[in-house]
Amino acid sequence: MKTQSLIDCIEMTDSYKRYGKVKRVIGLMIESKGPASSIGDLCLIYAKGQSGKVIKAEVVGFQEENILLMPYLEAASIAPGSIVEATGESLRVKVGTGLIGQVIDAFGEPLDGKLLPKGLSPVSTEQSPPNPMKRPPIREKMGVGVRSIDSLLTVGKGQRIGIFAGSGVGKSTLMGMIAKQTEADLNVIALVGERGREVREFIEKDLGKEGLKRSIVVVATSDQPALMRLKAAYTATAIAEYFRDKGQNVMFMMDSVTRVAMAQREIGLAAGEPPTTKGYTPSVFAILPRLLERTGANEHGTITAFYTVLVDGDDMNEPIADTVRGILDGHIVLDRALANKGQFPAVNVLKSISRVMSNISTKQHLDAANKFRELLSTYQNSEDLINIGAYKRGSSREIDEAIQFYPQLIQFLKQGTDEPALLEESIAALTSLTGNEE
């Protein structure tokens, strides 16, 4: 009986390998007649001539009976009639503890040209978000080593937060501080669409040797094709998921989700999607929730995620910023005006919020944070009157108190890049400053 079933399987097996052929290339898109494949499948295109070059491409759409492919790398060697082979699966990368301390590309290959260590497991970059009913509630704090965040915008294990800022306000520096000082087991950092110069600068200056020892950095620079930039985000997320499923608490950082959206916009427009708000295609707003919902907690471990959002002209209501803010569990606003005054990190605590802080903090801690915000808000609302000398002391008890405390508030918010700040010490300093000690 067993022999007969094996014979039946052999007879049903298609012994032919079917290939397709490139028909034309228009802009970023390659149109091919066959082979049979699905959206997201990885295909191999064999360049004509003596180069023997094999170019990886992904199926991004269909047009009549042809498939639309987008290459991961430059398509310079592709010509009409180039053979296309379907692999039947999506992009997979090799993951394991051997990647810690490495800087890799979207394919999971080291950028220094060295071979990958042995003992890595292949995982698909396309995963489903955890079942909402299997997500444990956030109940524990996650120290990030930044005093203003730990005390006033306390982050929980498995929380997802956006860092909203314009260019040159200190996003990379803040990410480096978090990577070096966080309580997490390891960092996974995605640098998407960055300038080539900035990548090495971030790794050597902001992250440093100590930070890199406990980090995996996934890089796709701005000169690379849109698909590589998009896949870098998926690869980094898949790596973080692997370690979360091993029971670890992962710190995940992506700089920036705006450039991920721009990469998807390029792909969507090339595939023929209609542009909507600010030229973004409908697929941009479809992939963002799918990508961002993959992080967080599951029954095995946690991914605490920080996504930077580059806001054009410091406009916090532009489409990507607005969409991401609605998906995440809180947002941190870096203010250019504070940076110009020399306050670093330039966190505007009055415009920022952590949506899980009330669930993981004591009443004493929350009262101290509210008191701090009240004092800072009172001073800022009256700052013009105070600066021109129009306010007379004694006119308002609240303003008098705010003036008295203001220098201490600003000093509390300032922190050097190499100045360590433990979670409990930051909270204790806050309660002491506001007089909310037990």
UniProtKB/Swiss-Prot annotation:
Domain of life: Bacteria
GO cellular component, one term: type III protein secretion system complex
Major localisation: cytoplasm
Molecular function via GO: ATP binding; ATP hydrolysis activity
InterPro entries cross-referenced by the UniProt entry: AAA+_ATPase (IPR003593), Armadillo (IPR000225), ATPase_a/bsu_AS (IPR020003), ATPase_alpha/beta_chains (IPR050053), ATPase_F1/V1/A1_a/bsu_N (IPR004100), ATPase_F1/V1/A1_a/bsu_nucl-bd (IPR000194), ATPase_T3SS_FliI/YscN (IPR005714), FliI_clade2 (IPR022425)
Reactions this protein catalyses: ATP + H2O + 4 H(+)(in) = ADP + phosphate + 5 H(+)(out)
Region (Disordered): 119-139
EC class name: translocase
EC number: 7.1.2.2
Binding-site residues for ATP, renumbered to this chain: 165-172
Keyword hit for Translocase: yes
GO process annotations (BP): bacterial-type flagellum assembly; bacterial-type flagellum-dependent swarming motility; protein secretion by the type III secretion system; proton motive force-driven ATP synthesis; proton transmembrane transport
Cell location: Cytoplasm
Coiled-coil ranges from the UniProt annotation: none
PROSITE patterns, per database record: ATPASE_ALPHA_BETA
Gene3D superfamilies on file: 3.40.50.12240
Keywords (A to Z) from UniProt: ATP synthesis, ATP-binding, Bacterial flagellum biogenesis, Bacterial flagellum protein export, Cytoplasm, Hydrogen ion transport, Ion transport, Nucleotide-binding, Protein transport, Translocase, Transport
NCBIfam families named in the record: FliI_clade2, fliI_yscN
Family: Belongs to the ATPase alpha/beta chains family.
PANTHER family registered for this protein in UniProt: ATP SYNTHASE, SPI-1 TYPE 3 SECRETION SYSTEM ATPASE
Function field: Probable catalytic subunit of a protein translocase for flagellum-specific export, or a proton translocase involved in local circuits at the flagellum.
Name of the protein in question: Flagellum-specific ATP synthase
Organism encoding this protein: Bacillus subtilis (strain 168)
Gene assigned in the entry: fliI
